[in-house]
């Protein structure tokens, strides 16, 4: 336990310091080699890498449409219900975010518009691993579907002789995704960035991944004209603010649900009760012993802090300084504090709002800024799948009046041609009279 007010500023900073995350020069070099190979060789490069990295004897790239359509037959009723519910809730929440164009007159004869346009082609990356991640498909695929993007490509790795898990295929089917690519890592990112014989080129790439995926996304965003990515990625994290009436078992469960993500995850508790912190420590020990990913969670807890603060108000100040990906509020009454929330990716209010709900099915998005980026980045939302452009229409009388602002500014900035583009029109208007 760390007593916040008794610690030096250096110790306080250390308690909020995240595990170092830095891509090695080796990772960057490998990614550059992979990107170049895919750019030059297309599908052949992807198939070669599937054999080399994924141990696939007879790899393929595109998943046939009939496999996607038949996927639900392989699901249990329980899992199908879960995916259907998550899809419906995420769609409901994000559908309300559909943007509306703006059109107004800034002054007589001057009309300005803001128009929203779906990004035409988007790529979604879904990591592989020991278990399928249909929730990752839903959190990104629903938004692509609602935006009306013309092309949506989903890439996910396949190991050995396995096929893409039917839960992934079914989630993709619900989201209207028909272009599924059996490819992972930096190669998949390169394929979506450059395009190959089987993989359409996209304009923006979404989705988490390992250090190779993260580096590849950064590289294509820097080198491929017009390419964008969603947001910087980092280890998962949660910060819990709790008071003296909070449930220590609930707190421990929430902390461990993040700690099990990875050894580089970080969890922090800010509480004004020494007794609750001590009980939480005991609950962590009990619950940790039952976890299948106990070793991973233990390593994450080594990077974590249980902090005693003087007041809940102070806890919010410390939280704002940290900028958590997930912020959980276990307070007798959170209402007075909601406006004090700063720099948090997503907030979970009350004893019965576990972070797991947002990860899967409440309706909010689980793609969130980590590593302190919540101070400047937002959770993934529908606007991330749109671009905007502006329109202005000016009448003769409108330009005549507006020229009184344009000409002095153009002259002050020494841009004669700018001024002339207005003056020549004013002269034409004068000659018409």
From Swiss-Prot:
InterPro entries: Ald_DH/histidinol_DH, Histidinol_DH_CS, Histidinol_DH_monofunct, Hstdl_DH. Pathway: Amino-acid biosynthesis; L-histidine biosynthesis; L-histidine from 5-phospho-alpha-D-ribose 1-diphosphate: step 9/9. Belongs to the histidinol dehydrogenase family. Keywords: Amino-acid biosynthesis, Histidine biosynthesis, Metal-binding, NAD, Oxidoreductase, Zinc. Gene3D superfamilies: 1.20.5.1300, Nitrogenase molybdenum iron protein domain (3.40.50.1980). Binds 1 zinc ion per subunit. GO terms for molecular function: histidinol dehydrogenase activity; NAD binding; zinc ion binding. It catalyses: L-histidinol + 2 NAD(+) + H2O = L-histidine + 2 NADH + 3 H(+). NCBIfam families: hisD. Its EC number is 1.1.1.23. Zn(2+) binds at residues 258, 261, 359, 418. Catalyzes the sequential NAD-dependent oxidations of L-histidinol to L-histidinaldehyde and then to L-histidine. GO terms for biological process: L-histidine biosynthetic process. Signal peptide: none annotated. Pfam families: Histidinol_dh. The active site is at 325 (proton acceptor), 326 (proton acceptor). Substrate binds at residues 236, 258, 261, 326, 359, 413, 418. It comes from the Bacteria. It is an enzyme of class 1 (oxidoreductase). One of its GO terms (cellular component) is cytosol. This is Histidinol dehydrogenase. Its cofactor is Zn(2+).
């Amino acid at each position: 336990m760390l007593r916040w007010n008794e610690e030096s500023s250096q110790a306080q900073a250390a308690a909020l310091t995240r595990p170092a995350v830095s891509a090695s020069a080796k990772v960057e070099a490998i990614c550059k080699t992979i990107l170049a190979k895919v750019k030059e060789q297309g599908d052949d490069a992807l198939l070669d890498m599937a054999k080399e990295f994924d141990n696939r004897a007879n790899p393929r790239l595109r998943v046939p449409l009939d496999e996607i359509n038949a996927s639900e037959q392989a699901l249990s009723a329980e899992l199908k219900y879960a995916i259907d519910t998550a899809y419906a809730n995420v769609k409901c929440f994000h559908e309300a975010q559909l943007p509306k164009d703006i059109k107004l007159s800034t002054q007589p004869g001057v009309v300005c518009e803001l128009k929203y346009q779906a990004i035409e082609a988007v790529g979604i990356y879904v990591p592989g691993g020991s278990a399928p991640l249909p929730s990752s498909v839903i959190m990104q695929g629903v938004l692509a579907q609602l935006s009306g993007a013309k092309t949506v490509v989903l890439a996910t790795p396949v190991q050995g002789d396995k096929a893409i898990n039917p839960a992934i295929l079914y989630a993709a089917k619900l989201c209207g995704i028909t272009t599924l690519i059996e490819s992972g890592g930096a190669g998949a990112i390169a394929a979506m960035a450059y395009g190959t014989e089987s993989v359409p080129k996209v304009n923006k790439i979404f989705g988490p991944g390992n250090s190779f995926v993260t580096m590849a996304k950064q590289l294509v965003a820097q080198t491929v004209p017009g390419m964008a990515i969603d947001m910087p990625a980092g280890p998962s994290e949660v910060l819990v603010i709790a008071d003296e009436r909070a449930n220590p078992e609930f707190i421990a469960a929430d902390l461990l649900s993040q700690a099990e993500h990875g050894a580089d995850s970080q969890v922090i508790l800010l509480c004004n009760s020494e007794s609750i912190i001590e009980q939480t420590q005991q609950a962590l020990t009990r619950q940790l012993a039952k976890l299948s990913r106990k070793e991973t969670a233990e390593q994450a807890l080594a990077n974590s802090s249980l902090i005693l603060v003087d007041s809940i108000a102070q806890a919010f100040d410390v939280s704002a300084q940290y900028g958590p990906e997930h912020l959980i509020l276990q307070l007798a009454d959170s209402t007075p504090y909601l406006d004090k929330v700063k720099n948090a990716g997503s907030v979970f209010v009350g004893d019965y709002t576990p972070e797991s709900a947002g990860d899967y099915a409440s309706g909010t998005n689980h793609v969130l800024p980590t590593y302190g980026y919540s101070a400047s980045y937002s959770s993934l939302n529908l606007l991330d799948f749109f671009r905007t452009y502006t329109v202005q229409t000016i009448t003769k009388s409108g330009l005549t009046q507006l020229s009184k602002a344009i000409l002095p500014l153009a002259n002050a900035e020494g841009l004669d041609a700018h001024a002339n583009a207005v003056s020549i029109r004013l002269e034409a208007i004068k000659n018409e009279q």
